[in-house]
A protein has these predicted regions:
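Phosphate/diphosphate-binding loops
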Residues: 363-388, 880-884, 1015
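Amphipathic alpha-helical
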Residues: 16, 158, 162-189, 194, ...
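Metal-dependent nuclease catalytic cores in nucleic-acid-processing enzymes
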Residues: 58-75, 326-337, 369-372, 550-566, ...
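Amphipathic alpha-helical blocks
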Residues: 10-28, 269-283, 886-899
């Protein structure tokens, strides 16, 4: 028996146990098939999974299950990203550490061990969460970035880069986190709005009293490192004579910005005294505004230079600090400026910072502004809210500073990388052609070094004596005396002897953690230590991650792969979106809008969760809505009830499938089979194009709308026919075909329900394999698709729905038969469909006859839509009423007293029809019903009402479908005269008596009439 209610928890518990007890995953994985190399983008082992991580793994699991069911043997090794700041910062928080000094005091070895333990502990917890979502992966054999064979792949990659001249150490301005005291890649910087100072500063021009170049900055702390001013060569600049506080000043700035800047400085009177192009200002020298506070500045020349990156914004004169900005740095290198960086790793000024030495740079802003004000060099001071970069892990504001770092020369690879992007299949296409290409086109050399502890150590050793460099490309090159451990500080103890006799010691840096995952497509295969799997599988057939990975994992993989193999490491990339709340906001604890996967599973089950997240187009952001999630569960209940209905009757008749006999199929059977194959074809096409959302949507359209709400209603009378009736058997064969095929299609999406239905329903009526996942995804049988039949049935359903709408207007319930239904249409397709399926329309609309007419007697009545015109026209609405009276039809657009309105919105069109009729429109015509009832119709109506009540009472008594009863009705028997036998057959009553009731009795209100009904179970099921 199938339980009356769909219970996801019970189903999941049973299926989990079945899979585990019978090692179903292992049996499915053991099947031979074509190669399909999937690489799992490794999540950081930083804690519990969130909604987005869950969605990501469900997408992957669905695709892998589909591939297994379509003749492939996909790799399904889960990956774990276990190094880097994501782990370090979490461990620091656990230990209460604030700075790197705390780590070094605690001990690097001890800290690294804590990071290892933390990463492994979270890997285990997250594994259980993924398993809870029904994700089938090789959880016993994951790839982990902390394993020696994986770390070896990173070392080998850097060795290749070194051999190709693509690895270099250089001084460069980089993103820097002063809390973590390390360089960061662009992909590791998160931006959000922050308030900062916005100041306009006057730089005194040398040898020109009271003359100043005006600059603007939001980082006053970089002014101690100022080395130049940049202007645009072709921008027009002016020297302005201005009066302020009885003092004459001469200000140099961009002409088009002068008025707004002077207003900020509260200059009352001013005039332009000179005009020139930016290139004319080149070489103009100025005195550093803080040379007294930063004495080192007195030894350098400060002047104006040209730069194309300058724009006509703020003042048009840009303050240049080559030690604190990338464009500034590049200009400094070009012009031979000092790359001055008086800031240490902690973001604190060094002794070179003069007066500000020992101060954290951000804390120095106010003092620097005060000094400028005191020296009368502060033209204006404001606050600005702008997007500012923050460390992706500790969330501290970053700074820009020049430091010695190790770089991969992406600039030399960019052309090849862009060519390789074009060879990859991107889903959606614009993920590659637009988003990713834009990122790569603007990419700079990749800073791969990090000044941290928990990561893959850079395999670079440098001789202390002669500076000779050695890049180790394999862990086999390292002399080990004990257990192999490539992590710090053990690896730091390894010393090589240089040819010069000196000691070669490892540079202290570790890899950018994005480089770890960047080698995943070969590192996960232990290449190059082991080559067999790599040579069979690489490159990856498929990967999928969120759209943030265009500048993360997609990029790091492409860069590393082009270095090693001169080609992309993946063939197909599916880019998916983010999970947001229903208002489109990022989920965060501070907003209180975080939804955990477990919460959703608790309410709607694992299959409900999977189907809900998979309903959304993968590349769009998923706006989580509890209402929409619960709606999935409501639809699954409809699916369950449809299967339960089928199972109940088919098992009563001990049905066993023998295959479809086309000669016995009725029009509704052929239609649902056509719809099944259309769904099958659409699902197959969608899956081949990674459009998972289309499959889920089409499944519910088909199984809920077509099968449950339509086909089952059409065949209900047939299941009551004799056991061996060809009509009944054809219905059963059709139902079985639908359930069998539909659940094989949806199995990758809803594995628990599909497996349960397969084991408890499908296996009852045919010999089955041990698991639905040992079956094949069904190929579409296009010869069964009859598009004309589908189109005709669509017309019929529209007509039936219109008839239902007309009934509602007439207040006539569907159980009450009507004498006549008239269809007004000139559409030959509608006329043809009605003639072919007249019996279906009659049955579903509960009418005795149908007429088709080209035109029905009616009068068009037009009325203003006051809800629309009232707020718009107000007092003029009366005039609009008069205007409507002049119309014969609804115009497409209305121009009324200068206001343009849509006719269909401003005017309500209704028809006045003959007395006794009601109507409703459909897309190709109008349906009219004759609503008046005669005595014969009333008798049938009351009979149907009695049947419905008895059937409800049978359910309340929990009677089996085949059980017989005795029925007693306390009412005037003349009201249902002639319908007694019909009532008995429909309710399985062996007796129907009128008068005093007995047994289980209830009083009912039927159309205002109080009627008592009593029913009794017969002594045997056969009656």
């Amino acid at each position: 028996m199938i339980p009356a209610k769909y219970s996801p928890k019970d189903i999941e518990a049973e299926i989990f146990k079945f899979w585990d007890d019978n090692r179903i995953y292992e049996k499915v994985k053991a099947k031979e098939g074509k190669k399909f190399y999937f690489v799992d983008g490794p999540p950081y082992t930083t804690g519990r999974i969130h909604l987005g991580t869950a969605w990501n793994k469900v997408i992957k699991d669905t695709i892998l299950r589909y591939k297994r069911m379509t003749g492939f043997s996909p790799t399904d090794t889960p990956g774990w990203d276990m190094h880097g700041l994501p782990i370090e910062v979490k461990v620091e928080q656990e230990l209460g550490f604030k700075t790197k000094r705390d780590i070094e005091k605690y001990g690097i070895a001890e800290f690294v061990q804590k990071c290892m333990e933390y990463a492994l502990r979270n890997k285990d917890a997250m594994t259980e969460q993924f398993k809870m979502l029904g994700v089938w992966m090789d959880w016993e054999n994951p790839y982990m970035t902390i394993k020696a064979e994986y770390m070896n792949a990173a070392w080998w990659t850097i060795r290749i880069a070194y051999e190709k001249g693509l690895l270099e150490r250089k001084k460069m301005v980089v993103n820097w986190c002063p809390r973590c005291e390390t360089a960061l890649a662009d992909a590791e910087v998160e931006y959000w709005d922050e308030e900062d100072p916005s100041i306009y500063v006057k730089f005194p021009v040398k040898n020109e009293p009271n003359t100043y170049i005006v600059i603007w900055t939001t980082t006053p702390w970089t002014l101690p490192a100022n080395m130049a001013v940049a202007v645009h060569p072709s921008l027009e600049y002016v020297k302005i004579k201005a009066l302020k506080d009885d003092r004459i000043e001469y200000l140099i700035l961009a002409k088009e910005l002068a008025e707004s800047v002077l207003a900020k400085g509260d200059y009352k009177l001013w005039e332009i005294v000179e005009t020139y192009l930016g290139e004319d200002l080149v070489g103009l020298e100025y005195e550093h505004p803080l040379s007294d506070e930063v004495p080192l500045q007195k030894k350098w020349r400060h002047a104006v230079y040209i730069a194309d990156f300058v724009t006509a914004e703020n003042t048009g004169c840009v303050h240049i600090a080559p030690g604190h900005g990338l464009e500034d740095y590049e200009l400094g290198v070009k012009e031979g400026l000092e790359i001055f960086n008086p800031v240490d790793d902690r973001g604190v000024y060094t002794e070179e910072g003069g007066k500000y030495a020992g101060m954290f740079v951000k804390d120095a802003n106010d003092e620097i502004i005060e000094d400028l004000y005191r020296k009368e060099l502060l033209l204006a001071e404001e606050k600005i809210v702008h997007r500012y970069g923050h460390c992706w892990r500790c969330k501290s504001p970053i700074i820009y500073r020049s430091t010695e770092q190790w770089f991969l020369k992406i600039s030399k690879l960019k052309t090849l990388m862009l060519e390789e992007i074009d060879k990859v299949r991107w889903v959606p296409e614009w993920a590659g052609s637009a988003r990713f290409k834009d990122w790569v086109s603007n990419a700079k050399d990749w800073c791969i070094s990090r000044q941290r502890y928990w990561g893959i150590p850079l395999p670079i050793w440098i001789c202390e004596k002669c500076g000779e460099m050695k890049v180790v490309g394999s862990i086999n090159e390292v002399p080990w005396e004990s257990d192999l451990d490539l992590h710090r500080p053990k690896i730091d103890e390894v010393v090589f002897k240089c040819k010069c006799g000196g000691d070669m010691k490892r540079v202290p840096d570790v890899f950018d953690v994005w480089f770890d995952s960047g080698v995943a497509s070969w590192g996960s295969l232990a290449y190059p230590l082991e080559a067999d799997e790599f040579e069979k599988l690489w490159p990856a057939d498929f990967i999928t991650e969120g759209h943030d990975q265009t500048r993360g994992w997609f990029y790091s993989q492409l860069g590393a792969s082009v270095i090693c193999f001169s080609k992309a490491p993946y063939k197909t990339v599916l880019m998916h979106g983010f999970t947001l709340d229903e208002y489109g906001r990022k989920m965060s604890k501070s907003l209180g809008n975080v939804v955990e996967p477990e919460e959703v599973v608790e309410q709607i089950g694992v299959d409900g969760f999977r189907l809900y997240v998979l309903t959304s187009a993968p590349w769009e952001d998923l706006r989580f809505s509890w209402d929409e999630a619960r709606n999935i569960n409501r639809m699954l209940n409809i699916v369950w009830n449809a299967v339960r209905f089928a199972y109940t009757y088919m098992s009563i008749d001990k049905f066993k499938t023998k295959g479809l006999r086309s000669a016995d199929l009725k029009v509704e059977d052929k239609w649902i089979l056509s719809r099944l194959e259309s769904f099958n074809k659409e699902a197959y096409d969608a899956m081949e194009n990674y459009q998972l959302h289309r499959v889920v949507r089409k499944f519910f359209d088909f199984f809920v709308e077509d099968f449950s709400r339509w086909y089952i209603q059409l065949i209900r009378p047939r299941v009551w026919e004799e056991k061996d009736s060809p009509s009944k058997l054809a219905a059963y064969e059709t139902i079985f075909k639908v359930i069998d095929k539909a659940f094989r299609i949806i199995a990758p999406f809803a594995p628990f329900l599909s497996e349960w239905i397969y084991r408890h329903v499908i296996s009852e009526f045919k010999d089955c394999k041990e698991s639905i996942f040992l079956e094949s995804f069904p190929p579409p049988r296009e010869e069964f698709i009859d598009l004309e039949l589908e189109k005709n049935m669509e017309i019929v359903r529209e007509i039936v729905e219109a008839a239902s709408n007309a009934r509602q207007k007439a207040r006539r319930k569907l159980r009450w038969p009507l004498r006549k239904l008239i269809i007004e249409t000139r559409d030959e397709g509608v006329k043809s469909a009605v003639k072919k399926m007249e019996s279906i329309i009659k049955m579903q609309s509960n009418v005795k006859s149908i007429e088709i007419v080209n035109e029905f007697e009616k009068e068009l009545v037009l009325k203003p839509n006051y809800k629309v015109i009232g707020p718009l026209l107000k007092a003029r609405a009366k005039d609009f009423v008069e205007y409507v009276k002049t119309l014969k039809e609804v115009p497409e657009t209305i121009n009324f007293e200068g206001l343009e309105l849509k006719g269909s919105e401003a005017i309500i069109a209704e028809y006045k029809v003959p007395e006794g009729y009601e109507y409703a429109e459909f897309s190709r015509g109008i349906v009219y019903i004759y609503k008046e009832l005669d005595d014969e119709l009333r008798k049938e109506a009351y009979a149907r009402e009695i049947i419905r009540r008895i059937q409800e009472m049978r359910k309340e008594m929990d009677l089996d479908v085949e059980e017989f009863i005795e029925s007693y009705v306390e009412m005037d028997s003349k009201l249902i005269e002639g319908w007694e036998e019909y009532i008995k057959s429909e309710t399985r009553s062996i007796k129907l008596e009128f008068g005093e009731t007995t047994g289980y009795t209830k009083e009912w209100d039927i159309e205002g009439m109080k009627i008592k009904i009593g029913i009794k179970r017969c002594s045997s099921k056969s009656g």
